[in-house]
Amino acid sequence: MKIKLANPRGFCAGVDRAIEIVNRALDVFGAPIYVRHEVVHNRFVVEGLRTRGAVFVDELDEVPDGALVIFSAHGVSQEVRQEADARGLKVFDATCPLVTKVHMEVMRYSRDGRECILIGHAGHPEVEGTMGQYDSANGGAIYLVEDEEDVGRLIVNDPGNLAYVTQTTLSVDDTARVIDALRQTFPEIKGPRKDDICYATQNRQDAVKELAATCDVVLVVGSVNSSNSNRLRELAERMQTPAYLIDGAHEIQPDWFAGAASVGVTAGASAPEVLVQQVVQRLRELGGEAPAEIAGREENIVFSMPKELRIPAVNQS
């Protein structure tokens, strides 16, 4: 059985930065460090940080006075920021800069009194944070839609003064259909100059399409609460290729590969490469050949760290 590895796969720049912020905060300030929500949606990563002394909480009222808190990569609402400020908490913001870009768009629409539609999944932390950037005091409102059916049911106050933004980890194809529905329903709607779906989401979806087209089975390494990982599994399944979302090699079932000549492996943007390599090792134990990397789009984006957590340059003499 051939093993093919998607490229790119796994960690994106925003996830790398968020995890590094927690690790460096632990190095500099010591445990405990409080993190609002899972810093990224991956069980292996979260458990590793918890072992080092990170304490994951749902809300700020679980954070003691005077403690240090980190906001997750998914971002937080203005209300959460204001609560942290009011309590005098020391904050490091691990919000992905590409999520922050969407936040800035929403705040601009809010200031201008333009109504805004967010395309996203209800209940996802990124969606809650983005919705929470909109201040309706200027007379506008923000609405959430997930699919074309939601668009058909949507009633807005001012169709002539309307814009849309999107969650960064959506299915590219699904989102395009929702945007088409929005444009048909609200012909004057404005959109971002550049798509809000992030480069890593796009690249990983392109790569899994290639896997699904050439493999009999696809494995997606990622946790069940990871939006972008779920989209990868769904995309492979839509191409009529059996696909499984797994947290690690221990979840692999040998009967998935009955009659399969090839298996493709990819990983969501919050899944570390060590898990991919463990999956490959398990597949080889089940008779898989040495893995082959599929050519893909190179990624070299790096996001900067907060100043207090940057490693000082070594003096050259």
Curated annotation (Swiss-Prot):
[4Fe-4S] cluster binds at C12, C96, C198. InterPro entries: LytB/IspH. Pathway: Isoprenoid biosynthesis; dimethylallyl diphosphate biosynthesis; dimethylallyl diphosphate from (2E)-4-hydroxy-3-methylbutenyl diphosphate: step 1/1; Isoprenoid biosynthesis; isopentenyl diphosphate biosynthesis via DXP pathway; isopentenyl diphosphate from 1-deoxy-D-xylulose 5-phosphate: step 6/6. Binds 1 [4Fe-4S] cluster per subunit. Its EC number is 1.17.7.4. Keywords: 4Fe-4S, Iron, Iron-sulfur, Isoprene biosynthesis, Metal-binding, Oxidoreductase. Pfam families: LYTB (PF02401). Dimethylallyl diphosphate binds at H41, H74, H124, S226, S227, N228, S270. GO terms for molecular function: 4 iron, 4 sulfur cluster binding; 4-hydroxy-3-methylbut-2-enyl diphosphate reductase activity; metal ion binding. Isopentenyl diphosphate binds at H41, H74, H124, S226, S227, N228, S270. Transmembrane segments: none annotated. It catalyses: isopentenyl diphosphate + 2 oxidized [2Fe-2S]-[ferredoxin] + H2O = (2E)-4-hydroxy-3-methylbut-2-enyl diphosphate + 2 reduced [2Fe-2S]-[ferredoxin] + 2 H(+); dimethylallyl diphosphate + 2 oxidized [2Fe-2S]-[ferredoxin] + H2O = (2E)-4-hydroxy-3-methylbut-2-enyl diphosphate + 2 reduced [2Fe-2S]-[ferredoxin] + 2 H(+). The active site is at E126. GO terms for biological process: dimethylallyl diphosphate biosynthetic process; isopentenyl diphosphate biosynthetic process, methylerythritol 4-phosphate pathway; terpenoid biosynthetic process. (2E)-4-hydroxy-3-methylbut-2-enyl diphosphate binds at H41, H74, H124, T168, S226, S227, N228, S270. This is 4-hydroxy-3-methylbut-2-enyl diphosphate reductase.
